[in-house]
Amino acid sequence: MSSSLQELCRKKLPDCILPEFFDDYVLQLLGLHWQDHGSLQRIEKNQILVQQEPIHINEALKVAASEGNYEIVELLLSWEADPRYAVVGALESKYYDLVHKYYGQVKDCHDILPLIQNPETFEKCHELNSTCSLKCLFKHAVMNDMLPILEKYTDYLDRWEYCSQMLFELACRKKKYEMVVWIEGVLCVGKVTSLFTIAISNRDLQLYSLGYSIILEKMYSCRQDPTFLLNHFLRDVSIKGLLPFVLKTIEYGGSKEIAITLAKKYQHKHILKYFETWES
């Protein structure tokens, strides 16, 4: 079969119901047979049938690339599959010729990283951009919940306090709470209280509460009095009128009297009303 006729069939036939008498040989001639998988048919923009079983086109592309099946990869890309999945699949199976061929259609490795679950593949993908640094890798590891990357470089990071502090604050801003706990507990973070500033700025009550859980446990274990710390941030959230944060601070031992005094001073009626109702 001529290549032009085969190309026409690959484009037009998949949108139709394939005749039952099309055996594997005919489908191979048409370019619509995937070795070890079966017939291929496009049914929607993002869905195909593989041997009559529905599968997302991008998942199929990832599998085809992981098998090094150039023809099927090309076919699925012609059906508008996302080339990022070709890069991921090829990286996982170390088909680097395919990686470099299709990476050019993506251009930025950081657009691929969110699709990757395996830390080794994640790091290999990041290396596709030769201008990126380890600090960049660590930042994207935080943003994509790739803790094994940080664990691999723990000794390196532990000697780099500036980077550890930056990653800690990034995890706070991105609401990566497990990362926050791990970084604070394992690496050298010089200013843990920056967590509260970020939590208040972003109105992130969960992070705010997490901060107290982390810091107070350490202070109590060292027999330190947390009153100054609690009332320092209580003043901040009271002045801003952030009732949920006020209540959370009082829950951990902050002074209710300070909150009421500042609510009166800054005329935060909703805070005053809450305490009046609470006391009555």
UniProtKB/Swiss-Prot annotation:
The keyword Cytoplasm does not apply. Transmembrane segments: none annotated. InterPro entries: MGF_505. Keywords: Early protein. Induction: Expressed in the early phase of the viral replicative cycle. The keyword Kinase does not apply. It holds the Pfam family DUF249. Belongs to the asfivirus MGF 505 family. Plays a role in virus cell tropism, and may be required for efficient virus replication in macrophages. This is Protein MGF 505-3R. It comes from African swine fever virus (isolate Tick/South Africa/Pretoriuskop Pr4/1996). The lineage of its organism: Viruses, Varidnaviria, Bamfordvirae, Nucleocytoviricota, Pokkesviricetes.
